Amino acid sequence: MLQEMAHEFAAAEVQPNAAKWDRDSNFPREAIRKAHELGLLTVKIPEEYGGYGMGSFEETLICEEIGWGDPGFATASGSTMLASYPLITGGTEDQKQRYLSKVADGCIASYCVTEPDAGSDVQSISTQAVLDGDDYVINGSKMWITGAGHADWFFVLAYTDKQAGYKGMSCLLYTSPSPRDGLLSRMPSSA
């Protein structure tokens, strides 16, 4: 039933619009909203935070069908869950309440790991975060952040203790400012 619903959604909403989204370089926010309303984008969010509490198998079935409609849409619609996984597995109760509940309500999140000089090689990232009072100051550059111009919050991977190697990496949650002037620059994409 879940797989069937995802396939029907992909056939009706995704596949007919994929070429236009690519041609116009548009983020498919309205279609993502519709997928969210059907429950296709929150299957792994635990029930206590408003999701369905299902597993990877169910999510894979959905992603496969959405990807059938358009792999680009599967990536765009999946970026929020990618940013949410670290919270599901290691977030504090406060973080889960604050961010996962927002995901269940339809917000968009972005996963910020890739860097200009490191690509997606996590071990080679150079972004650092330094504690300044109660907040962290993040210094570095991230790129290829799916949905960044539409995200309500960001998962940012940075070193808080470079000398400790991978154990000195931290996941920071950054709530998107509005307006986003100066925060983002758009790079042309081709599909």
Where in this protein do the model-derived segments appear?
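A structural signal for short hydrophobic beta-strand segments in well-ordered beta-sheet cores
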Residues: T127-V130
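Short secondary-structure junction/hinge motifs that connect adjacent elements
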Residues: P16-L38
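A short, Trp-centered hydrophobic/proline-enriched beta-strand micro-motif
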Residues: D105-V113
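Buried hydrophobic positions in well-ordered alpha/beta secondary-structure cores of metabolic enzymes
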Residues: A10, I62, T92, Y111, ...
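Active-site-adjacent elements of ketosynthase-type condensing enzymes
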Residues: D117-I125
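Internal helix-loop-helix
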Residues: H7, E37-G106, G147-W153, G165
